[in-house]
């Protein structure tokens, strides 16, 4: 291993190593021999772009981490990736590339067959690019065999769900009010209506004249004037109070609680409430439509214009308490209208234009016609007030066109009938985290029937044929079934337009049945992935592999893919197809905003990789709590790169010294070295096996962030920052020293085990280290197995002692900083005063560790009472607390504290309270009544920690100062060795020119300097060498020369 951490170089080498040696293929062959099965289904990304979003990279990295882990645990893992290739996004992009803007142009100008071919080409090219990006990031999946939702086998398999729904009586054709995109000319399901924009629309109050009462009007409010030509009735709430309000010569009917607000908005100052009455009185009241003379459809429904009870659908939060109702353009209106047998008037075509029955508005785009409608209302004195409103309005998730609601005939699956079954399956599944269950459960409670039909081209054709003679419906469950009943040949490509030519013989009348022109909802495609991706023999494969062990995606997929899988699973198999669901967060920018190119805050993964390398990105992603949103941060990536460098250096240290001493791990057993273990070795083994146990437990819940954080923390905090600082000098012992062998054995053991775990997170770095460091290795670290937990090595008592030691060290470093004494400068002694006798007994066993890390020749451990010899704690009154507690006695209490400061302080520190008497009253002080001020004996510095106090002398002896200077010089020499790229086993020739008054000091410590720097000789005075540098040490200049010697340690 090289000492330089250079991921940009070695990651490319590792990638080439994997490819040249077919590592994934070999791993798969090994993996398939395992008896334990792990079925994973990839939530297929949509290939609308050739470059993955960094959020998608996070998603794939989590998946890769889990799949790598399950392989290491001995599972045969199904890791087929997939791509969700159908649907509007690709159609819209293809339209742009072809320079067209409508469905008509697809049919008339391009041709459906050519359009489908172009869509497929787009999906394939982008999928290839995405695959290359994922492979480049070390995602080990079966990239040679991905599933595509456009594949014939996949489409054929998916038809089984439609067939099953038909057989269960769940498939039907019906009219519902649905969102419609006028540009794409297709319907959208409720869950597809997820994008909103702030749009400015009219906000108008309209008067409907009451029949038989020339001056009385029902007042309604609407922000969609274009729906008024389709008005059928007015809804009220029969339990609300309504008012007749005189305005000029007219009487306006308005909900009583909305009168004041409406008059203010309409700027009507002169009005009078004539009477107030229950809404029930208005029921059945008939009215005249103000546009009846110019909208021909209105003449056909004149006798239906009346007031109906809408119940809770009518509120008093806005409007007038009277609701304009058009069953052809509102889902609530539709349901209420159906209850009262009202007609459905829908005057809008697929393009969003008014039909001929709209009279003067025919042929006009509905939203554009609103101003004309308002003008016509005004001309007919039916407009009470008009203004503008900015509100959040749904738009098409792909083309961003404002959606409209239309009552249209579509194909549905009656999912609402399965609600209880769906809820039962949600309870059975394991949701990580728990709130995922709540969110999807709330959605299912409100589930509506699934509109599965779409009026587009690039999608899975619905396998529904209708007989032209008797209207018999034939639903096909797969291409084999279709081949048996078709009159003509089934095409090789099951897409439109080819599938549209297939004619089926009607089994009822012998007539010819033709396929409906619709394609499936794109969510249908990904929702069948759990079985449709398994190939032609999916039933057999599912019986062997199912159910799916895990699915994981972003939290938006609770209402998307997770629900879609659940729905199709229950329709087809009566159960959820998955056992566990893991939810991850969104990738946001540093301000917490979603990252988009259009927002200017988007960072491509390649930008991160080119700067830091792949594993820095992977580690940073995986250390974020999986189900929480992550904020992208260059600073965090810098820190992650630093942590990787520390991990690298730990392995470099181990590799360097073990190679130097030709240490072979396999030569020794635990029994060989156990008698030579020191407490720090026992502690490290305990920490390692505890970490291993915690990681394995966390991964039962797929908590990859805990895996990433626990393993890296173990190497950085426990090994690098603690263990190696304690044991580093043991590596300088003789090669066959049993103390050294014990240290090597323990270090190698925990480093190899940790590396195997790390390979799931940072596979490039782990593979590089594995190939260079691990002895008697396999061809790849991915072929290893997770080590077994050995409970007998977990020692809580020792771990607790070392945790206290860590606190002592931190406090000691704090005390050094207060005293201005650098860590390299040795101390004669450090006092540690501990509150607990148990802690004192534990720490007395590891004073060598403290001595090494605090750089002190002696560590003196005492109980907390010993600290009193060096310090005094005084109490001063806390007047803010004394006044409210002691009231009239507060002045005397404060005086008492001042006069008895030491005693009060001692009692409160030792007992938590101090009792005393003032004016014959027994009183008690506690910590809230005083401020404690600590005074340490002159010449000493202390630092408190949770278990006690560390104390050291502020002034150093001459001997200590001398040793400090020598250690500073040694550090400079070691740095120069590094600049010369010398190995630790190579000797140097050393020369030093020191200030005149320090020459004797150098001579005194000559042998120590030579030993510490591996100097074959040391000359004092004239300086020469391959590298010569001036150094400032304690404000004096030393010139040092270093050359490589001709001999090295054997």
From Swiss-Prot:
Subcellular localization, per the record? Answer: Cytoplasm
Give the first-level EC class, as a single word: ligase
The record's listing under PROSITE patterns reads:
AA_TRNA_LIGASE_I
Q: Which cofactor does it need?
A: Zn(2+)
Q: Where is this motif: 'HIGH' region?
A: 45-56
Q: Give residues annotated as binding ATP.
A: 597
Q: Which reaction does it catalyse?
A: tRNA(Ile) + L-isoleucine + ATP = L-isoleucyl-tRNA(Ile) + AMP + diphosphate
Annotated GO CC locations: cytoplasm
> One biological-process term from Gene Ontology?
isoleucyl-tRNA aminoacylation
| InterPro entries, per the entry | aa-tRNA-synth_I_CS, aa-tRNA-synth_Ia, Anticodon_Ile_ABEc, Ile-tRNA-ligase, Ile-tRNA-ligase_type2, M/V/L/I-tRNA-synth_anticd-bd, Rossmann-like_a/b/a_fold, tRNAsynth_Ia_anticodon-bd
CDD domains with a match to the protein in the record:
Anticodon_Ia_Ile_ABEc (cd07961), IleRS_core (cd00818)
Assembly, per entry: Monomer.
Which HAMAP family does the protein's record reference? Ile_tRNA_synth_type2
Q: What does this protein do?
A: Catalyzes the attachment of isoleucine to tRNA(Ile). As IleRS can inadvertently accommodate and process structurally similar amino acids such as valine, to avoid such errors it has two additional distinct tRNA(Ile)-dependent editing activities. One activity is designated as 'pretransfer' editing and involves the hydrolysis of activated Val-AMP. The other activity is designated 'posttransfer' editing and involves deacylation of mischarged Val-tRNA(Ile).
What PANTHER family has UniProt attached to this entry?
Answer: ISOLEUCINE--TRNA LIGASE, CYTOPLASMIC, SOLEUCYL-TRNA SYNTHETASE
State what protein this is by name.
Isoleucine--tRNA ligase
Provenance organism: Sulfolobus acidocaldarius (strain ATCC 33909 / DSM 639 / JCM 8929 / NBRC 15157 / NCIMB 11770)
**Name of encoding gene:** ileS
